């Protein structure tokens, strides 16, 4: 990367103008995207305009199109909805309306349009672009614009960001707003669960999503619902019979409640709608259960955006500006979307076409095709749901294997969800599943018991670790561990935990040379708030911790905004890993985030103080600085606080907050529940396969490197990687992987906080095609 290229990003937008609008239904996280578009646009030297009230504002012009400033997008990151307003616009559907919109853009010299909305809004934008030259011709003929203006605005660049709570847009794994909508739904489901258990009730919950069952499907996975109705996969013709049998079976197993999730577009095989009332009447009539219906409605669109949506919106906004400014008359209108944790650019019309194909397939009752078109992520969710909710464990355990599940390290939200799915998938496969209490220590002491189906009932939504977890490593107690492996006939180990789970795995590999009993397959599922396990881009529990930090930062910023001229220094957890500090910095709009991976000196601290001094001269009179707990042994939180207090005398005062163990607590977020559930299922499927492969002469013998793995999410796929192969990628002294993907997001944090830095554009997304993405390895 040459210095010239580095510098190019800062001058990329000079002489250009970008307009940003939000259209269609609002979604949480739209404000994060608007803020990123405005700030990165200004950073590149472009002028940026707000278009208020969506396409209606574009058509009406006047005060609806206003130039944005750096400060005009301050304090909007944590707000739900869209601050610049949205409207469903009839005028823009007519050519006359689009002509007026073109006139309003040309007069302001705007040739770049960033549209944040659903598929309808994006299709409208593409139509507008394809007609652009004709519209200019008409305006010239009518004498409304000069030839010079027409030449200057000869082509229109369009980039779309998908903002929709339904996640119904093909080509992106997550749309802006989906994660926050899931947060709202899960909060409600958790609240309803307690009342349902008290009265032994059945609840039928109707969630939004139009013709897409994503919200309903993920909700049912995240709360362990008994049944889900989604439009893409209508139930079989005798579903009434199956549903009632399933509900009464659950009650027989000792459950005090039933939860049924219905997508608002749910239909049967003949395309006839299935309503919540129909289901309620059926359950009351056939089973006589006390049944209530709750329609969640617009609650799902409201509230604060989750950390995931704020980061997604910010990343997509940055990418959108780059795509617009790099655009030429020949580049097609594109959508910036998410694949795994990678930002990708896809041709807008290809995505719209596939989205329409889903609707068409459903109308033609080709449900299998509709499911495939929704993408790998959707299909994986559906497969895991079907296994957990509809397959019964076999009665006989003949030819079964024994697998033990344990937690290692510090507690992390989502551990219990991973244990639940591991245990249940194991039972479904006909295995005996044992649970080990208190990690490797419990394995050595024999704190082991068999788990049945209902042992893990209701665990998905519970935080912490119900099995108990310890940081103890196995090496010291190999003899006792080997004895217990023989005593309980353990043939495979699923280890759910943080860095200790990984190092424990390495020790088990080492111990195989001495103890034959340790020659059994094992798999590590990364679960730690620090997100520092080699071999995985994400760990179970990190998303929950991130949201906890985010909520706290929002409250602290609000306090600072009230007092004025105040800077807060907040210390986050994570050991030496700066993931939480960096991502929370992005999600909470921090001015700086100090981390171990990016060494800093006293000069950097001084520069940050200078930066805050300048900031206090603007209308935004507050500061937020995050510091990872082990970023530097000498520049402690107290040191930074004292430095800021001294240097800021008379200009701002400082306060400090150490967040501590609250970051490990709380009920798991939908992302962590879902991720943990799928990781558990995937791990158990792998385990069954490898046990069969390692079965020789009546016993298990696994001593190959690939029989001890970490299951991790890498870019776009879930992969099993031998722990021994990951050794070279690990910095053991600081307990972090040598390469971390999220470090590439650090410059975004600095630009959004108004630092003059060089932006490396070499890693920006390139245009891909949707067909390739669908056939490639899917994300979780």
Swiss-Prot record:
The modification N-acetylthreonine is found at residue 2. Substrate binds at residues 164-166, 201, 208-210, 264, 292, 298-301. It catalyses: beta-D-fructose 6-phosphate + ATP = beta-D-fructose 1,6-bisphosphate + ADP + H(+). GO terms for molecular function: 6-phosphofructokinase activity; AMP binding; ATP binding; fructose-6-phosphate binding; identical protein binding; metal ion binding; monosaccharide binding. The active site is at residue 166. Residues 2-390 are annotated as: N-terminal catalytic PFK domain 1. GO terms for biological process: canonical glycolysis; fructose 1,6-bisphosphate metabolic process; fructose 6-phosphate metabolic process. Its cofactor is Mg(2+). PANTHER family: ATP-DEPENDENT 6-PHOSPHOFRUCTOKINASE, MUSCLE TYPE, PHOSPHOFRUCTOKINASE. This is ATP-dependent 6-phosphofructokinase, muscle type. The gene is PFKM.
């Amino acid at each position: 990367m040459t210095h010239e290229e580095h510098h190019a990003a800062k001058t990329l937008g000079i002489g250009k103008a970008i307009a940003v609008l939000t259209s269609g239904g609002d979604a949480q996280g739209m404000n994060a995207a608007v803020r990123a578009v405005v700030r990165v646009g200004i950073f590149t030297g472009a002028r940026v305009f707000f278009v208020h009230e969506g396409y209606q504002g574009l058509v009406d012009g006047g005060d609806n199109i206003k130039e944005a400033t750096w400060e005009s997008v301050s304090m909007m990151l944590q707000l739900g909805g869209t601050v610049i307003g949205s409207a469903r616009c009839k005028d823009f559907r007519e050519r006359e309306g689009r002509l007026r919109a073109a006139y309003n853009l040309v007069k302001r010299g705007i040739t770049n349009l960033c549209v944040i909305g659903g598929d309808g809004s994006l299709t409208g934008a593409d139509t507008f672009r394809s007609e652009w030259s004709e519209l200019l011709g008409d305006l010239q003929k009518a004498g409304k614009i000069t030839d010079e203006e027409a030449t200057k605005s000869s082509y229109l660049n369009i980039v779309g960001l998908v903002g929709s709570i339904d996640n119904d847009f093909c080509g992106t794994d997550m749309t802006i707003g989906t994660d926050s909508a899931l947060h709202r739904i899960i909060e409600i489901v958790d609240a309803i669960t307690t009342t349902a258990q008290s009265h032994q009730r059945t609840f039928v919950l109707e969630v939004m999503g139009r013709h897409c069952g994503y919200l309903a499907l993920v909700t049912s996975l995240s709360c362990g619902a008994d049944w889900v109705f989604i439009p893409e996969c209508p139930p079989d013709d005798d579903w009434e019979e199956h549903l009632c049998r399933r509900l009464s079976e659950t009650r027989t197993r000792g459950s005090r409640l039933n939860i049924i999730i219905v997508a608002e577009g749910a239909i049967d095989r003949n395309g006839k709608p299935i309503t919540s009332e129909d289901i309620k009447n059926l359950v009351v009539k056939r089973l006589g259960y006390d049944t209530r219906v709750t329609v969640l409605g617009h609650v799902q669109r409201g509230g604060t955006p989750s950390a995931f949506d704020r980061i997604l919106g910010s990343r997509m906004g940055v990418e959108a500006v780059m795509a617009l400014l790099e655009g030429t008359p020949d580049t097609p209108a594109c959508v910036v979307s998410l694949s795994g944790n990678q930002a990708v650019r896809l041709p807008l019309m290809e995505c719209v076409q596939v989205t329409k194909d889903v609707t068409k397939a459903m109308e033609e009752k080709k449900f299998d095709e509709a499911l495939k078109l929704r993408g790998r992520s959707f299909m994986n969710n559906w497969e895991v749901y079907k296994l957990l909710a509809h397959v019964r464990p076999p009665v006989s355990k003949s030819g079964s294997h024994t697998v033990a599940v344990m937690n290692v390290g510090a507690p992390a939200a989502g551990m219990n969800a991973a244990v639940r799915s591991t245990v249940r998938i194991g039972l479904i496969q006909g295995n005996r599943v044992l649970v080990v209490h208190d990690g490797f220590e419990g394995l050595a002491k024999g704190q082991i018991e068999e788990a049945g189906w209902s042992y893990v009932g209701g665990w998905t939504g519970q935080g912490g670790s119900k099995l108990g977890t310890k940081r103890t490593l196995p090496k010291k107690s190999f003899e006792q561990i080997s004895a217990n492996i023989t005593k309980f006939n353990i043939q495979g180990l699923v280890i759910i935990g943080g860095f200790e789970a990984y190092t424990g795995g390495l020790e088990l590999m080492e111990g195989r040379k001495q103890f034959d009993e340790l020659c059994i397959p094992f798999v590590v599922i990364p679960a730690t708030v620090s997100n520092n396990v080699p071999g995985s881009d994400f760990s179970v529990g990190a998303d929950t911790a991130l949201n906890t930090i985010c909520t706290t930062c929002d409250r602290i910023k609000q306090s600072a905004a009230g007092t004025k001229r105040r800077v807060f220094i907040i210390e986050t957890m994570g050991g030496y890993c700066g993931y939480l500090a960096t991502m929370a910095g992005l999600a909470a709009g921090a001015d700086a985030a100090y981390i171990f991976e990016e060494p800093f000196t006293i000069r950097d601290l001084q520069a940050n103080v200078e930066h805050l001094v300048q900031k206090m001269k603007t209308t935004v009179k507050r500061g937020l600085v995050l510091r990872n707990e082990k970023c530097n042994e000498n520049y402690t939180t107290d040191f930074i606080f004292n430095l800021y207090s001294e240097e800021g005398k008379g200009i701002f005062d400082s306060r400090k907050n150490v967040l501590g163990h609250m970051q490990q607590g709380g009920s798991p977020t939908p992302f962590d529940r879902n991720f943990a559930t799928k990781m558990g299922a995937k791990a158990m499927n792998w385990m069954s396969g490898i046990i069969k492969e390692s079965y020789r002469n009546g016993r298990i013998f696994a001593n190959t490197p690939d029989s001890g793995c970490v299951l991790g999410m890498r870019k776009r796929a879930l992969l099993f990687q031998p722990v021994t192969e990951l050794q070279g990628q690990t910095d053991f002294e600081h307990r972090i992987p040598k390469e971390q993907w999220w470090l590439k997001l650090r410059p975004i944090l600095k630009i959004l906080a108004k630092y003059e830095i060089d932006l490396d554009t070499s890693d920006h997304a390139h245009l891909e095609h949707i067909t390739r993405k669908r056939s490639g390895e899917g994300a979780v």
